[in-house]
Design a protein with these regions (language model features):
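N-terminal low-complexity, acidic/polar interaction/targeting segments
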Residues: 1-198
Length: 198
C-alpha cells in the first residue's frame, strides 16, 4: 500500500480506514493469509517522472493487521502494527492491487550499547517535556516511552509518535544506524523545543 505523507515504523501502531476497491480486495486476501502487508510512503519527488504511478519510497515497513472491523458499507477500519523495515526491490504487479518485492533491512547499533543508552535516556527526557506540553495523550505517550529500554525500538516508536513532518519521518525510517537515528531525533526534538520556548 502506497500512501502520501506516511511512514510506518516497526513496533508502531497505525490506524487505517480502507475504502478504495483495490485496497478492500487486498485486505480480503491479507486477512485470508498471513495478515501482513507493506506500507510505503509516496515518493513525491518521483511522482512527476514519466510513467511514475504512485512511486513508493525505497524504504517501507511490513506490518501485521492486529485488529480489523468491517463496516456495513464494505469499508474497514484496521490497526496495523509495524514489524520490520524493508527495501522495495520492485513492483511485481499493479492489478488488482499493487504487490511489491521486498528485502528485509536490519538496523545496526552504530555505537556501543552504553552510548546508545545514554542518548536514549536523554532523548526520553526531552520527549517527555515536549509531550507534557502537547495536547491530550501526551503524558501517556511520554510515560510509555520511558518504559521502552531498547534504543532501536525506542527510536522507532518515538519517531513515529513525535515527528509530525512526513519527510523527516521518512528520512528517520531510512536511517538504519540506530545511533544516527537517535541523534537525528534528538536534534529534531531539541529544535522543536527551542521554537516552543522562544
Amino acid at each position: 500500500m502506497t500512501l502520501p505523507a506516511t511512514a510506518l515504523f516497526p513496533q508502531a501502531l497505525m490506524p487505517l480506514h480502507i475504502f478504495e476497491p483495490r485496497y478492500r480486495e487486498m485486505l480480503r486476501d491479507v486477512l485470508a493469509s498471513n495478515r501482513l502487508f507493506a506500507v510505503a510512503g509516496l515518493d513525491a519527488a518521483r511522482a512527476s517522472e514519466p510513467e511514475a504511478e504512485e512511486p513508493p519510497h525505497r524504504v517501507a515497513t511490513v506490518g501485521i493487521v492486529r485488529a480489523c472491523q468491517k463496516n456495513e458499507n464494505g469499508t474497514s477500519n484496521l490497526l496495523l502494527q509495524g514489524l520490520c523495515r524493508v527495501e522495495v526491490v520492485s513492483i511485481a504487479h499493479e492489478v488488482p492491487y499493487r504487490k511489491i518485492r521486498v528485502r528485509a533491512l536490519s538496523s545496526t547499533a552504530g555505537a556501543s550499547a552504553a552510548e546508545n543508552e545514554v542518548l536514549r535516556a536523554e532523548l526520553a527526557r526531552l520527549i517527555s517535556v515536549k509531550l507534557r506540553l502537547a495536547a491530550a495523550g501526551g503524558k501517556e505517550m511520554a510515560a510509555f516511552l520511558r518504559t521502552v529500554d531498547d534504543p532501536e525500538i525506542f527510536s522507532d516508536i518515538a519517531a513515529f509518535s513525535v515527528c509530525e513532518d512526513a519527510r523527516v519521518k521518512q528520512r528517520l525510517l531510512e536511517t538504519l544506524d540506530v545511533h544516527r537515528r537517535l541523534h537525528k531525533l534528538f536534534d529534531l526534538v531539541t529544535q522543536t523545543q527551542h521554537q516552543i520556548f522562544r
